[in-house]
């Protein structure tokens, strides 16, 4: 049997397709999501429906975004889904999640088993509509999850760490071995929950998110340089020091809170 053939579908490398097949892992994920029938839940990249089908059993409706036309057609024709499935056959990077939230008149819950090549750009895309999202559950490569959870002064800590931790509380749920998927990937995966902060309870309020984007981009684009050099076009050494940051530090030595303080100093 061809290792990339599963349930009559050839996994497409360009879409990063690895299908979740372990029933125990699937049950754990569904339990952690804990869906309610009336909620608006969106699954990104449902594939062959490993999560879609058990979720549909508990939902009045389920929205899915699937780029692969063959998989989209299979889901549309599935008898268990025909009365509940709302399918968007398109690139998730073109989806306006605020518009979807307005259409269904409530905040969104989002989940997905994300391929490595889209995980970072997709997270930044979702941040644009974060105010319309209740929570997110994602299966990611363990390396990416380590970056989301990383603390300052570590190798894994980078711009992604700062921006995710600014927007959300990051909660690891479970690690998933390669043999839980078909075809079997070469890496471990992990499931995480992202809980967006609300403005009134945000630990690091920023007046303009574009300023935080600018500061972190400048710092981490030249992460081996000192802040004196990487942020010299934005701040004087005195301004850095007044924020409690030594100009001789590098990007990975600065906490999320300190980046937010710097963003709020920009005019």
Curated annotation (Swiss-Prot):
* CDD domains tied to this protein: AdoMet_MTases
Which enzyme class, named as a word? Answer: transferase
Positions contributing to S-adenosyl-L-methionine binding: 18, 20, 45, 66, 91, 113
GO CC terms for this protein? cytosol
Q: Which reaction does it catalyse?
A: adenosine(1518)/adenosine(1519) in 16S rRNA + 4 S-adenosyl-L-methionine = N(6)-dimethyladenosine(1518)/N(6)-dimethyladenosine(1519) in 16S rRNA + 4 S-adenosyl-L-homocysteine + 4 H(+)
GO MF terms held by the record: 16S rRNA (adenine(1518)-N(6)/adenine(1519)-N(6))-dimethyltransferase activity; RNA binding
Which PROSITE patterns does UniProt cross-reference here?
A: RRNA_A_DIMETH, SAM_RNA_A_N6_MT
Q: What is this protein's function? A: Specifically dimethylates two adjacent adenosines (A1518 and A1519) in the loop of a conserved hairpin near the 3'-end of 16S rRNA in the 30S particle. May play a critical role in biogenesis of 30S subunits.
**UniProt cross-references to PANTHER family, sorted A to Z:** DIMETHYLADENOSINE TRANSFERASE, DIMETHYLADENOSINE TRANSFERASE-RELATED
Protein name per its UniProtKB record:
Ribosomal RNA small subunit methyltransferase A
Q: Which organism is it from?
A: Hamiltonella defensa subsp. Acyrthosiphon pisum (strain 5AT)
Q: Which gene encodes it?
A: rsmA
């Amino acid at each position: 049997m061809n290792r990339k053939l599963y349930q009559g579908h050839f996994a497409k490398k360009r879409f990063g397709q690895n299908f979740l097949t372990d029933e125990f892992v699937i049950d754990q994920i569904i339990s952690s999501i804990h869906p309610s029938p009336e909620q608006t839940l969106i699954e990104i990249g449902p594939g062959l429906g490993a999560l879609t089908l058990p979720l549909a059993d508990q939902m009045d409706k389920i929205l899915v975004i699937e780029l692969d036309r063959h998989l989209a057609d299979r889901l549309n024709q599935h008898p268990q889904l025909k009365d509940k499935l709302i399918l968007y056959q398109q690139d998730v990077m073109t989806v306006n999640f605020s518009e979807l939230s307005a259409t269904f008149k409530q905040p969104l819950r989002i989940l997905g088993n994300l391929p490595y090549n889209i995980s970072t750009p997709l997270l930044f895309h979702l941040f644009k509509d974060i105010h319309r999202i209740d929570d997110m559950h994602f299966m990611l490569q363990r390396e990416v999850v380590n970056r989301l959870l990383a603390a300052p002064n570590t190798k894994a800590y980078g711009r992604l760490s700062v921006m995710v931790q600014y927007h959300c509380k990051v909660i690891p749920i479970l690690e998933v071995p390669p043999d839980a998927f078909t075809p079997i990937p070469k890496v471990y995966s992990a499931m995480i929950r992202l809980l967006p902060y609300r403005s009134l309870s945000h630990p690091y309020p920023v007046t303009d998110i574009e300023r935080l984007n600018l500061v972190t981009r400048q710092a981490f684009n030249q992460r081996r340089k000192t802040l004196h050099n990487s942020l010299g076009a934005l701040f004087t050494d005195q301004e850095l020091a007044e924020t409690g940051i030594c100009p001789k530090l590098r990007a990975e030595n600065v906490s999320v809170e300190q980046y937010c303080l710097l963003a709020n100093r920009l005019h």
